[in-house]
């Protein structure tokens, strides 16, 4: 699996801000980076799964859509919520969050984000799934977060079945703090003068 090194992430983010493709694709890419979910989880996301007005916004992904067949909670950073607000202006906020450009009743193509990465000059160097690896590396190396909280946020299942049977903790309070820290870390990787203007990306 092709994945960027953490040192390559700042340049990628700057190139992403210059992306000239469809606006929903741009927003989808930013949302994937902020949440490091799997591509399939993003493509099939429905608005009914999101609780955005809560003091602790969260995305609840149903078990049937998860690789490990277990319901997954994604605490949403302020930045992720702002992305979704912009997405709602495009997709309508009623059914699919990231619909196909050609048919609002069908999900975004499974290769849409990958091809956008290629257009940015990262063919064979990066994939959408690779952001999960980058996030895992940075979060673990920061030594700010419990490894179990990181693994739970990545929706990985404990390989040790005995431990898995006893460790059902969601680590939600820590994961909320971690996801906000991650979003702020991502934003800090760009030069201070580079302010994300979501409106500049065409619909």
Model-predicted segments: where are they?
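C-terminal catalytic core of tyrosine-transesterase DNA break-rejoin enzymes
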Residues: 4, 30, 34-41, 112, ...
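Basic, Lys/Arg- and aromatic-enriched nucleic-acid-binding interface segment
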Residues: 1-45, 55, 67, 90-91, ...
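Conserved tyrosine-mediated DNA breakage-rejoining catalytic core shared by Y-recombinases
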Residues: 43-86, 158, 164
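Short, polar N-cap/turn motifs at the start of nucleic acid-interacting alpha helices
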Residues: 48-56, 123-125, 144-165, 188-194
